């Protein structure tokens, strides 16, 4: 039986069931080993179909790219994108390197985006250029005009002090 604690939206269940001592990457590696040729994801918008081997190869490439940019274990990586293949890759790539994935609502406008990035301490933001009528890159330029002159990986924004890099 679960019960609310202090009337908040936190619920604590039974603690008698042991935790699974596996990481997401180790679990996926095991699934890949057993079922690498099987379908892992189908993206109806793009028509792409990925097996577990495809998914993990792509996620490993993104993880290597993030590491080469200076993203490490414990860093917060935001993704501001609609549901797309890149979102899935980012989820697995950040888990692979031990970075913390911060999901940014694709409908956010500038004030909500600023709050989310500041509050979560996002140092790297992976973003789509736009979503529907929302110009993501324009909103980022409004929030961080320093983008116009910053060297890649060396953004220093007054409004977004933790953000160092934007990946598109």
Model-found features: residue ranges?
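Flexible acidic/glycine-rich loop/turn elements at helix↔coil and beta-strand↔loop transitions
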Residues: 30-37
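Short, flexible loop segments at the rims of nucleotide/cofactor-binding pockets, characterized by
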Residues: 16-19, 54, 102-105
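Hydrophobic alpha-helical segments typical of transmembrane helices
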Residues: 23, 27-28, 112
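Flexible, non-catalytic linker and terminal segments flanking ANL/adenylate-forming cores
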Residues: 1-22
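Aromatic/hydrophobic pocket-lining residues that form π-stacking "cages" and hydrophobic walls in ligand
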Residues: 28, 90, 140
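Conserved AMP-binding/adenylate-forming core of the ANL superfamily
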Residues: 20, 37-92, 109-114
